[in-house]
Every structure is written in structure tokens, then in C-alpha cells.
A protein has these predicted regions:
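Short, surface-exposed coil-to-beta transition loops
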Residues: 151-154, 244
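Short linear sequence signals and composition-biased patches located at protein termini or domain-edge surfaces
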Residues: 50, 54, 58-73, 77-82, ...
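Broad, structure-driven detector of short, well-ordered beta-strand segments within folded domains
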Residues: 153-162, 198
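Aliphatic-rich helix starts adjacent to a transmembrane/signal segment
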Residues: 2-75
């Protein structure tokens, strides 16, 4: 009887070769680098959109403040009982609170800086207010004095070159700071503003149609200014040159 012998075979364990492992590592690194690049790009895009959104918000806010203030310029609670707006409080002309002396009867008034960064250009608006009319100043407060005797409220706008901020200071003629909360103290309205330049629209006698815009030093009769053209320089959040925005606002209560 023949006996068949079976020789057991050695079992070989399956595994990765060095080449296969290197290929797998390479693919993994490519995927990792791709995910990292995508994350960085998304993060940079978010930051850019955030900076752009902040810039646009600052532009809208600054122009809203100035537009509302100029629209109120020259306002009287009762035109029949008022002939002029008195401007008896003259702010200093230091860099901390520029302004100059506003002529009586004017709803808007401005001073030029002459190119000196230490004495920024300013824009003033004035209106008569009663405690019951609800007019809000540029710092968010209203006149809290008499309900029958109007006071002159003045908003003074300028740019602080040390902080690149649009500032506003409110004065109430001869009544002190008690007549309006925070009056007399400069307040930051909008950040990221490096410069403000203002031109004033004049019209021929007997006309409301503006035919020229002039610098503040050229205006001789401030109560006849029909429009205000404001140019604001905003700090570019992406570097490079400032972003310039120009807006023209009609003076509603001009003579």
C-alpha cells in the first residue's frame, strides 16, 4: 500500500511593500496640504470680507451722521419767532477741538486746515432747538432746557489725525453742559477716517441752483450756502492708498 505524504507549505503573511507605503504617505500629504490650503484661503477670505464690511459700515455711518446734521442746519422750531441763529459760544481752534467762530445766522460753517495736519478742517452745523422737538445731536443727545425758549445747538465735526477718527463736539450757546448731556466733550463717531475736506455750494442771488463749489476761505456769506460737498478719506484696510468717498448734501434751510 502506497502512502502519500503531504508536505505542509509555509504560509506567507500579506503586507505593504516600501513602495506602496511611500505612495500612501505621499497621497496622504497631498490631501493634508490641500485641506490646509483650503482652510487658509477660507480664513483669509473671511478676514477680507470682514474688513470690507467694516469699511462699508464706516462709510455709511459717517455719511449718515453728516447728512442728518446738514439737513437739520438752520432749523427753527417756529420760523415766525426767530430771525437768526445766534452762535455765541466759540470753540477753540486747537487740534483737540477745532472750529473757530461761527457767524450768527449761519446754518453751516467751516474752517480749512491749510494743509496742516495738526489743525484739521472742521465743519459746523447749527440749529435752534426746544426741549420738546426731539432733535438729536451728533453725540446722540437732545437739548434738555426750555420748552418755550429755543437754544442754538452746534455740531462740530473734524478728523483727529492721531487716531484717524471722525469726531464730533456739541456746544449749546451760553447754557453750559447741563443743557445737553456730554455737551462740550469731543466724541468719536467713526474710526478709520484719515481726512475730511469740505466744499460749499453757492448760487447766484435769487436762485437755489448751485453753480460753484468753493473752499471755506472763499465763502463770505455763510447763510447763503446751498449745499455741502464732503470728501472723506478712509484708511484702506488692505494697505495702499486711502479710499476716497465724496457726497453732496443740500442745505434745506438756507436763505
Amino acid at each position: 500500500m502506497n502512502t502519500v505524504r503531504h508536505t505542509p507549505r509555509r504560509s506567507h503573511q500579506a503586507g505593504f511593500t516600501l513602495v506602496e507605503m511611500m505612495v500612501a504617505v505621499t497621497i496622504g500629504l497631498i490631501v493634508l496640504f490641500g485641506m490646509t490650503a483650503t482652510f487658509v484661503n477660507l480664513k483669509n477670505t473671511f478676514r477680507s470680507q470682514d474688513k470690507l464690511g467694516t469699511l462699508q459700515d464706516n462709510e455709511r455711518l459717517a455719511l449718515t451722521f453728516l447728512t442728518n446734521s446738514i439737513n437739520e442746519a438752520g432749523y427753527y422750531p417756529d420760523p415766525k419767532s426767530a430771525s437768526t441763529i445766534t452762535a455765541s459760544v466759540a470753540p477753540t481752534t486747537s487740534p483737540a477741538s477745532p472750529g473757530g467762530t461761527m457767524p450768527a445766522g449761519a446754518g453751516v460753517f467751516g474752517t480749512a486746515d491749510g494743509g496742516a495736519a495738526t489743525s484739521p478742517e472742521s465743519l459746523q452745523t447749527a440749529y435752534a432747538s426746544l426741549s420738546t422737538d426731539g432733535l438729536i445731536s451728533c453725540i446722540g443727545t437732545s437739548y434738555a432746557g426750555s420748552a418755550t425758549v429755543a437754544a442754538t445747538v452746534r455740531n462740530i465735526y473734524y478728523v483727529d489725525p492721531t487716531t484717524n477718527s471722525l469726531m464730533c463736539r456739541v456746544l449749546v450757546n451760553g447754557l453750559g453742559t447741563d443743557a445737553m448731556a456730554n455737551a462740550g466733550t469731543p466724541q468719536v463717531l467713526v474710526t478709520g477716517v484719515s481726512k475730511m475736506a469740505v466744499m460749499y455750494g453757492l448760487a447766484p442771488a435769487g436762485s437755489m441752483q448751485v453753480n460753484e463749489y468753493v473752499s471755506p476761505g472763499t465763502v463770505t456769506a455763510w447763510n447763503t450756502v446751498k449745499a455741502v460737498r464732503i470728501t472723506l478719506n478712509f484708511v484702506n484696510p488692505f494697505g495702499g492708498a486711502d479710499i476716497v468717498r465724496t457726497h453732496t448734501i443740500n442745505v434745506m434751510n438756507s436763505n
